[in-house]
């Protein structure tokens, strides 16, 4: 279990660092979300087995180890919550959109890419990121 925990911890730390780095210096909240989507996807499809272990094995953990991973995951999701809150506070998200549900469904959809993405296949990570961004922009963002 300690090997799983170490791999998962590294994956979550890498995810947080990757997201923070992607949005660092960008003050426009819409652009932060777009950059965040792409950073998350790049991490997923970048060939790191740590991410797969995190996504598909975390339920194997128990007790303190499981709680530690939940806490680290929650910290990562807090970065997304802050970006969505910024959009909402600036009136950029439709009033009928639940930010928490948007975050959960959005990250779930992005994470599922790891199960079907094929390097060299029909879609690149950029294609997927652009598509996800278009869906969010056209379905969630106020015009």
Regions of interest found by a model, annotated:
Residues 2, 10, 14, 49, ...:
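Short alpha-helical
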Residues 2-24, 31-42, 53, 71, ...:
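Alpha-helical structural segments
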Residues 39-42, 46, 78-90, 107-109, ...:
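C-terminal peripheral helix-coil segments that are non-catalytic and often amphipathic
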Residues 68:
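Active-site Tyr-X3-Lys motif and surrounding loop/helix of classical short-chain dehydrogenase/reductase
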């Amino acid at each position: 279990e300690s090997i799983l925990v170490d791999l998962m911890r590294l994956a979550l730390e890498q995810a947080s660092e990757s997201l923070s780095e992607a949005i660092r210096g960008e003050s426009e909240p819409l652009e932060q979300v777009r950059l965040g989507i792409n950073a998350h996807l790049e991490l997923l499809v970048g060939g790191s087995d740590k991410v797969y272990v995190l996504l598909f094995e975390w339920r194997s953990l128990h007790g303190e180890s499981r709680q530690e991973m939940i806490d680290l995951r929650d910290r990562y999701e807090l970065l997304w919550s802050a970006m969505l809150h910024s959009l909402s506070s600036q009136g950029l998200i439709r009033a009928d959109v639940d930010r928490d549900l948007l975050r959960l469904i959005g990250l779930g959809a992005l994470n599922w890419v790891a199960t079907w993405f094929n390097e060299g296949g029909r879609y690149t990570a950029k294609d997927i990121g652009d598509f996800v961004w278009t869906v969010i922009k056209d379905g969630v963002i106020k015009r």
